UniProtKB/Swiss-Prot annotation:
It comes from Nicotiana tabacum (Common tobacco). Keywords: Cell membrane, Hydrolase, Lyase, Membrane. Induction: Not induced by abscisic acid or by 1-aminocyclopropane-1-carboxylic acid (ACC). One of its GO terms (biological process) is detoxification of nitrogen compound. This is Bifunctional nitrilase/nitrile hydratase NIT4A. The lineage of its organism: Eukaryota, Viridiplantae, Streptophyta, Embryophyta, Tracheophyta.
Amino acid sequence: MALVPTPAVNEGPLFAEVDMGDNSSTPTVRATVVQASTIFYDTPATLVKAERLLAEAASYGAQLVVFPEAFIGGYPRGSTFGVSIGNRTAKGKEEFRKYHASAIDVPGPEVDRLAAMAGKYKVYLVMGVIERDGYTLYCTVLFFDSQGHFLGKHRKIMPTALERIIWGFGDGSTIPVYDTPLGKIGAAICWENRMPLLRTAMYAKGIEIYCAPTADSRDVWQASMTHIALEGGCFVLSANQFCRRKDYPPPPEYVFSGTEEDLTPDSIVCAGGSVIISPSGAVLAGPNYVGEALISADLDLGEIARAKFDFDVVGHYARPEVLSLIVRDHAVSPVSFTSTSSKAESSPK
């Protein structure tokens, strides 16, 4: 396989593709990961940007397009939301109000618009969003088919560190793997990908195209993505934002805690690193640390069977009589209401 660079698109991101040659005897899927920044606190403008990027990817023949974690709604990098042990500041509460206002309801008008985009450009779409459920927010991935249907969602089950003060915890009811004409598609978000039991649950559902929207641009992230591809015998598509300080509101409205004085408008605060990896652990496209980009590869689905001949983690390489996993895949609510179907009426005597 040879990495074939495509000339840069005017006023658009770099695009790269993998040439699979003419000898593949199995179906191929052209997949694109989007590396781009949210327009922070401006969800309508971010949706416009998402459509532009989706249209560009589709023009290159993409059948599946994966966006980064929290692309709609934004990843509040560097913010503390005014929190310390035993104290929340008024400024931090106002910051949360604005962040809450930038989130989207699922279902809701923004979901309908994303579905229409997927149908318009005839692509399967995996989109990272901040979901608003009343006054609780979730870091969520939405799935859409190429006919413009909303398939469902995955809520991040374990936010990391300070994310836990702004995002709720997903439960086992939203760990889907969708059987599509392109293959079986699912997603885990950022450091969820370091949770062996969650990965095992997805492998057990037969995942073939493993999407990993993230906010981690460190070099070590690539090792995790390669490991998952080898462990699961699946394609791994990791999409991250590429952000500069100027992509966030300026101070004092938005402050990168502890580092603001060291930043210029052009300082890189998230360097991307989006990548596509094959089931054999080969890097098909990326990682890109240069700027906003569309990163694409043609996925030879025959690679999955070839990889699983060596190692099938929930098949011939499993030992269920020694090691097994229980997944509670039902929704959990803090409040349950029960009532009788009818109330007996007493007759006056």
